């Protein structure tokens, strides 16, 4: 299974924000500069992360974005569930004549659940805390 770019960059944005000193705001422009992503794409990602409570956006002169909850409270599996369309096959009878007897959808559903259950074992904090090589690559001190 390959995550969409939307989910990939959503996770990267969260990793960046979690790597910053606690309480430090950043901007969408700063995140896009770090990862080389289009601003429009990142705005959509941050909006969805904000609606889900993972990011807080503050307007105004001293505004910006930051994590909406502690990194230790953000499970990677939950973020993937929020951002990723997890339907792996289109099992509509109008598209596939074996749908009434097919067991593929059930097998794939179990595989996706196993994948997400494993990701639930990791929080954003697990990915960033005391990760000096990451801080260096992100130019975060």
From Swiss-Prot:
PANTHER family from the UniProt entry: HTH-TYPE TRANSCRIPTIONAL REPRESSOR NSRR, WINGED HELIX-TURN-HELIX TRANSCRIPTIONAL REGULATOR, RRF2 FAMILY
Binding site for [2Fe-2S] cluster: 91, 96, 102
Function, in words: Nitric oxide-sensitive repressor of genes involved in protecting the cell against nitrosative stress. May require iron for activity.
Cofactor: record remark: Binds 1 [2Fe-2S] cluster per subunit.
Naturally occurring in which organism (per UniProt): Shigella boydii serotype 18 (strain CDC 3083-94 / BS512)
Cofactor needs: [2Fe-2S] cluster
Record's protein name: HTH-type transcriptional repressor NsrR
Metal-binding listed as a keyword: yes
UniProt DNA-binding residue ranges: 28-51
UniProt keyword Repressor, yes or no: yes
Pfam families cross-referenced by the UniProt entry: Rrf2
Alphabetical keyword list: 2Fe-2S, DNA-binding, Iron, Iron-sulfur, Metal-binding, Repressor, Transcription, Transcription regulation
GO cellular component: cytosol
